[in-house]
Amino acid sequence: MNKKFKYKKSLLAAILSATLLAGCDGGGSGSSSDTPPVDSGTGSLPEVKPDPTPNPEPTPEPTPDPEPTPEPIPDPEPTPEPEPEPVPTKTGYLTLGGSQRVTGATCNGESSDGFTFKPGEDVTCVAGNTTIATFNTQSEAARSLRAVEKVSFSLEDAQELAGSDDKKSNAVSLVTSSNSCPANTEQVCLTFSSVIESKRFDSLYKQIDLAPEEFKKLVNEEVENNAATDKAPSTHTSPVVPVTTPGTKPDLNASFVSANAEQFYQYQPTEIILSEGRLVDSQGYGVAGVNYYTNSGRGVTGENGEFSFSWGEAISFGIDTFELGSVRGNKSTIALTELGDEVRGANIDQLIHRYSTTGQNNTRVVPDDVRKVFAEYPNVINEIINLSLSNGATLGEGEQVVNLPNEFIEQFNTGQAKEIDTAICAKTDGCNEARWFSLTTRNVNDGQIQGVINKLWGVDTNYKSVSKFHVFHDSTNFYGSTGNARGQAVVNISNAAFPILMARNDKNYWLAFGEKRAWDKNELAYITEAPSIVRPENVTRETASFNLPFISLGQVGDGKLMVIGNPHYNSILRCPNGYSWNGGVNKDGQCTLNSDPDDMKNFMENVLRYLSNDRWLPDAKSSMTVGTNLETVYFKKHGQVLGNSAPFAFHKDFTGITVKPMTSYGNLNPDEVPLLILNGFEYVTQWGSDPYSIPLRADTSKPKLTQQDVTDLIAYMNKGGSVLIMENVMSNLKEESASGFVRLLDAAGLSMALNKSVVNNDPQGYPDRVRQRRSTPIWVYERYPAVDGKPPYTIDDTTKEVIWKYQQENKPDDKPKLEVASWQEEVEGKQVTQFAFIDEADHKTPESLAAAKQRILDAFPGLEVCKDSDYHYEVNCLEYRPGTDVPVTGGMYVPQYTQLDLSADTAKAMLQAADLGTNIQRLYQHELYFRTNGRQGERLNSVDLERLYQNMSVWLWNETKYRYEEGKEDELGFKTFTEFLNCYTNNAYVGTQCSAELKKSLIDNKMIYGEESSKAGMMNPSYPLNYMEKPLTRLMLGRSWWDLNIKVDVEKYPGVVNTNGETVTQNINLYSAPTKWFAGNMQSTGLWAPAQQEVSIESKSTVPVTVTVALADDLTGREKHEVSLNRPPRVTKTYDLKANDKVTFKVPYGGLIYIKGDSKEVQSADFTFTGVVKAPFYKDGKWQHDLNSPAPLGELESASFVYTTPKKNLNASNYTGGLEQFANDLDTFASSMNDFYGRDSEDGKHRMFTYKNLPGHKHRFANDVQISIGDAHSGYPVMNSSFSPNSTTLPTTPLNDWLIWHEVGHNAAETPLTVPGATEVANNVLALYMQDRYLGKMNRVADDITVAPEYLEESNGQAWARGGAGDRLLMYAQLKEWAEKNFDIKKWYPDGTPLPEFYSEREGMKGWNLFQLMHRKARGDEVSNDKFGGKNYCAESNGNAADTLMLCASWVAQTDLSEFFKKWNPGANAYQLPGASEMSFEGGVSQSAYNTLASLDLPKPEQGPETINQVTEHKMSAE
């Protein structure tokens, strides 16, 4: 019972991360297995601080003359004392499964979705008034985890749940069922809208030690049926929790990063920012009439598609209980196509197009008739209309073109989808035809992202060429050396954004494509000396890997936001050929240096051209105004200094650009100012004595953009404006002052919260660093140290191949490390280590250089100068290595700047979305990463993962026979693609074979079974399966439904059959005349089609039939299931069997066989099944097939129900009367349902759903391991997620089971009870009837009804709208209890008129007579109409269901119940605009209905139903 009516909005704590600063890396260990100092987001960033040794004097750099704003010459650098590092504070997140965040609870007094803790202290999490989880965090104090700032705590790992799988299962079940934001797939909200909800949660959490099935029933009745209404299209919540590999961290700095870590960097609002949005179709027209739901409000999209929301929250869209999809509210225009992945999004757009009418200005309007039809199929509508089916994509490039079927459109030609489609089209004057035949003409290599990169890099010849990209270094000063390369990470966290530039981080990262590698694939040097035949391979894009981006681009509406992670790039605009080192401008504004190449000028010209949408063109007579909030640019120079400064301006080479200083951005017109160059923060210009402080980084305590500025900038970009930000944000961005900046980036799908540089220096360093380069050429002798007096390798005399000892002995820990050779030499009486290293810069004459070389040769007798002049990384000889021409600085030999090679190949390699072969390989490497706990493979950014996974699903989820043809262009990478397919299909595809190397890897990593297994050649489905961790397995599992060459291990689901098939003939009823769709005539055969075995069915019927194998929901694309699949997502197969014909088929996984005819005449026919095995089948009171029949599932068929369940359940050990009693109870329930709805005839208006003389028409109830929506859902069959193959008990008790009453009640619910908002209520009235009839009282409402009158008084005439489903149920309960003493059914049946038997005079049941007569009257019953005015107010409708309910109840009761209905106002809807403190209301009973009721002049009750505060209790005797 809700005593508080305002929805609470929990403020979410910011979740953006902090990481340690990168230090300097002057030297190196000389290890060949050293990774570059910057990682790709999959490993921790080491913190390297200089040794506290005496600080040599810096080498002063020449100062240009004149210098207009000279910086003071820095003092000699301080020698920092080593300090004990404090244990860093970290940010924790309470999660389910490590990835689904829990909000609304508190941990250590802060929000559970981002709380601070210190490693070593306990974390205690509370929901309601209950401690639900305690965690020990001592392990987080490990030094190896210092760089990891974000930590997820899984509820399942709580100390309270340790050692009990039942407790874990029950705790998760309760939390997911209590979710108050079911539309948000990333979070679970434990925000209770009333004290009662909170107490209910507390009470249930204390009972988590119950058996799971018992607890599930308790939760289903107590929680799910009190669901907060109007929070999502469907309030059915799924108990599925993401499955994640133990040890993953949601921090991109971790060594083992979780698959969805990027979500933890999204903007989380700390304040309510009221926003207006628009829902549009793919043509940009507004979509009106769609329900939307957020945590802060709800409503229906307006005439132009407008809706209100609070920035950053999840927004869900739907029509009645039909779920269209949900998005984060971080933009103001949301397209239907964005509500799902590419395929689903196109289907949503097509569905709305089909069922909408055209409004003003070409808007799409969803009429109320669509909602009404959908309402007849509550929840199951999501299963009937499948939005994830393929939609006729055309795939390919050049000659390689594949056309896929349009399953989405085809589904409306058969079954219940056809019935719904026909009904809607009849009510809306015909539906719209498909807008185009192929909804998505898509090409995996469509190149949109690649095209943008090619433009900006100048690969596109219409743009300026950029071959070397300049990366500035930090302005720190250790030992006279400048800081490390600084490209601050700008991560794309949604598919609205993509990277523009990522630096390489593979082992040969500093070598350009086409150069010879320094390291081989095992990170060993190439042994090229005689007699070895080993030759170094070239660096190629196939072996390249990349760090996270430091330049990224995001789309916001029609505009763009580009972010570059360093402020020095602004100086290139001022002096495009004088920026790299010690640049500046003189007093006349002229650049003091002009020696830098054109590459970066060209890059900036490309950026300005692209961001302005070609409004500005270089070298052309074009002009553009650029707005900015920058006043000054600073040039990079030596020392810990800001650098030379100059006013922000454009060099004259950027012709035609005018700068407009700006401080506000409201109503800015992109036509007038197409581009803004902004900073989010002031610069850090003071740093005291901190030698690690980096000048010019963003001072996040001093924002330059307010939240209003950000709102205005987003509006500006939506209209087509572009924003360029060049800034070094070294912060985890948790500060309140940074929230506007974070929101701005988030709107474009970007985040800078990673707080790390992602560019490696060139490998310069101390002389002992292997593989290094200097500005000038060097000479170096690199070698592997001897082991036991011998090299760590041998060269085979015969094959000339190099054999490494550690590999031969399988001792990976003994892998040798390359070193720069050294020797000891006495200097002034001391032994000093001398390295075999020469920098030519130290030798001014040829004679000096020759002497230095000879000194090394003399130190190592037999050493020679290397002979291969084309390869500069030879070992075991004195090697010449050319210089880079980039000056190095100071005693740590750090280059002044770093250069990245750009080329067409680099562009393709960076994006790595070029072809199918690359894509499938990348997904495989991503899966290896998780299967090996990060030791192998490479993790994909979650945005890239989604993009590649969706692309590949389009290619793989069909039955196309792909092939590779030698000698033809292979633009799409079919060679690699088909090789992978062949590994899963035992070489069924033409042109390639599964290579031994790939096959071994797949077997070793448990993706397919090897020859030693009894399942050799099968794929391992790896349940529970999370596509974000194992995308290749998920893709192949999806394909296995079409491609029977992929054989899936079915041991876990549905179960293995080890019996040979047999031939069986059965006579099957084909008559079809259902009263309602949910009691249909699909016939069970009790036969099983084994997986991958040929089955044939021969028909002697004179009518065609449909054959169905397996009854299971399609889980494809259902986000909550895709992260924890326990079975193949698609299982059901259907086949058409013509009259007197035969059909032969194989099914992928096995399943029970069903036959459905459509004969309008009573008839049956023989069918002969070949290759089938028997399943346990109890029918007509006996076993037709024994319980020990081979199939894993069995069925019970009673007179009214067919019940499907794992066969052991059919032992029915929980039923004293066994299956006979269970069957009788099912039939009793079916008969009682007929009674409740007043159905007692075999034809006409009051025809029963099921009855003896309607053979073959029955309700269906099936148990499955995973279902599409909720714990259970309505439909034909009703689906239930209770699936316990090892249990001997039946999970259902038909005469005491809220779940079956609730779901079957959904199917049967009908007018006049089905008012708006009653979807999860009207069905439960049947359940109350069952409780009264078989348990003696309405237990479900017995407690809540005691305070119902007070609740009505406090609700101010809006009790319905303010309440949840449980509260609304009280309205019907009060009406029934009032009728118990105030309604006499006999008044309606005068003497001589027989009283139908379903009416009852029993105490506690008499009140139901009112409902039964209301149902009959709504169907047009005529008894005594003439006696009571002649007009049937239950059968007539003005279109308002709430009016009908009030008039019907009052007329049948012959009592004016207006006061009761005024207090409840059923059918009303509450909505709350973001920021509003009070709810608003709409709908409900109309004034005209009250006027009509008043005109009937019915007596008012002495005590109306609104006064009822208790239920009638009847002491039960056997009925």
Swiss-Prot record:
It is found in: Cell membrane. It holds the Pfam family DUF4092. It is a lipid-anchor. Keywords: Cell membrane, Lipoprotein, Membrane, Palmitate, Signal. InterPro entries: DUF4092, M60-like_N, Pep_M60_3, Peptidase_M60_dom, TCAF. The keyword Lipoprotein applies. Residues 1080-1380 form the Peptidase M60 domain. Gene3D superfamilies: Peptidase M60, enhancin-like domain 1, Peptidase M60, enhancin-like domain 2, Peptidase M60, enhancin-like domain 3. One of its GO terms (cellular component) is plasma membrane. Residues 22-107, 226-247, 1497-1519 are annotated as: Disordered. Residues 51-77 have a biased composition (Pro residues). Residues 31-42, 234-247 have a biased composition (Low complexity). A lipid is attached at C24 (S-diacylglycerol cysteine). It comes from the Bacteria. Disruption phenotype: No effect on assembly or function of T2SS-beta. Residues 97-107 have a biased composition (Polar residues). A lipid is attached at C24 (N-palmitoyl cysteine). Residues 1-23 form the signal peptide. Its main location: membrane. NCBIfam families: metallo_SslE (NF037973), SslE_AcfD_Zn_LP (NF037974). To V.cholerae AcfD (VC_0845). This is Putative lipoprotein YghJ.
